[in-house]
């Protein structure tokens, strides 16, 4: 049914909360803002980082760029490794690859960072292509990321594709492009968020995700 499966990265393949939140706190400290608690800052996980600083703190463009620079200063060297792969993801990817599925990554994270994470957890070999943002922030919206992944792999039959993610941006991006989606509840988005965004399927954990994907 679905021969091409697109995975979000943060909150779907790996739990990157610690590294992202600590790096956001580092950036906010530099700007002179006392960061909120971890639950507040978890909203930074998933959306493009520039968009988050602007939306949550109403920074002007110059301050956004300073915040992004400081975020990356810490995240590139330390934060990217403050990360854990969700239990069972590697087994799932192996089974899907064994069934001949084409696996793609569609993330708002810059491609070099995404590749670092995938290589760190030794799951990079399962993916045919990694689509993500450019370092300057271009192509960071999830719709653009998904479109780019499909274009670069010459995928025309949208009915053969499904997107998996934990936030509304993943689901909305999939709908905008015209493909089905699965929302996962083990990441950073809740049932209401994923349901209201229009997820075609919602699963609680990696086991449920595996059962669903292997049933297609």
Where are these regions (language model features)?
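Metal-dependent phosphoesterase signature
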Residues: 54-91, 99
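Substrate-recognition element of Asp-dependent hydrolases with the DxDx(T/V) motif
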Residues: 12, 24, 92-118, 127
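Conserved Lys-Pro-Asp/Glu-containing loop-to-beta segment of HAD-superfamily phosphomonoesterases
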Residues: 142-171
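Helix-loop "lid/cap" segments that line or gate small-molecule binding pockets
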Residues: 27-28, 48-61, 117-120, 149-152
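Surface-exposed amphipathic alpha-helices with a cationic face
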Residues: 90-97, 150, 171-175
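A short, structured active-site edge motif that brings together acidic residues
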Residues: 124-139
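Active-site neighborhood of HAD-like aspartate-dependent phosphohydrolases
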Residues: 1-43, 57
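Acidic, Mg2+-coordinating phosphoryl-transfer loop and its flanking beta/alpha structural elements
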Residues: 163-203
